[in-house]
Regions:
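A generic structural signal for alpha-helix starts
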Residues: 69, 85-88
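Alpha-helical support elements that line or immediately flank enzyme active sites
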Residues: 74-86
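Active-site phosphate/pyrophosphate-handling residues
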Residues: 47, 73-76, 139
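C-terminal binding/interaction regions
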Residues: 1-25, 87-154
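Short, thiol/selenol-centered motifs that function as redox-active sites or metal-ligating centers
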Residues: 66-72
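Structured beta-strand/loop patches that form or line metal/cofactor-binding pockets in enzymes
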Residues: 26-65
Length: 154
């Protein structure tokens, strides 16, 4: 049991903890063009995401995320990563993000759709991808993609 706790501590990096304690885009966008939400009924994690667009590009993102630190951190990171994408590219982002999280290797460079991503956001994606070594926690980092899949026009 002690080894499991020690191993899990590998996820508690300063960068991930910062996203968890001070999530980016942690606002409700009342004038959002599209929004979505998702809940993990097993653990109680929740996320709601609002997106404003300008000329079909994501111009603002608002998130409300509650639950474990991984859910909050991944929501924060993804909310930064999707800024500037077109709405039609969301599904491709979801697919590539899930592959990065679920496979044994790979990093943010594998998310081709994010080729012009800022270094700090890329580093955050690489940090959150370490969850792949803890299969039971992968769902925590994928809940944000479920909310994105559930987006609807307002």
């Amino acid at each position: 049991m002690e080894n499991e706790k020690q191993d899990l501590s590998l996820l508690y990096t300063p960068l991930i903890l910062e996203h968890s304690k001070n999530p980016k885009n942690n606002v409700v966008l009342d004038s959002a063009d599209i929004s979505g939400s998702a809940v993990n009924p097993f653990c109680g994690d929740e996320i709601s995401i609002q997106i404003q667009t300008e000329r079909d590009k994501i111009s603002s993102v608002g998130i409300e995320s509650t639950g474990c630190f991984l859910n909050i951190a991944s929501s924060s990171i993804v909310s930064q990563a999707i800024l500037g994408l077109t709405v039609t590219n969301i599904n491709e982002f979801i697919k590539q993000y899930r592959l990065m999280i679920q496979r044994q290797s790979g990093n943010s460079n594998d998310i081709v759709i994010l080729k012009n991503l800022e270094d700090d956001i890329r580093k955050s994606l690489d940090e959150i991808s370490k969850v792949r070594d803890f299969p039971i926690r992968i769902k925590c980092t994928l809940l944000v993609t479920m909310a994105l899949q559930n987006i609807k026009m307002n």
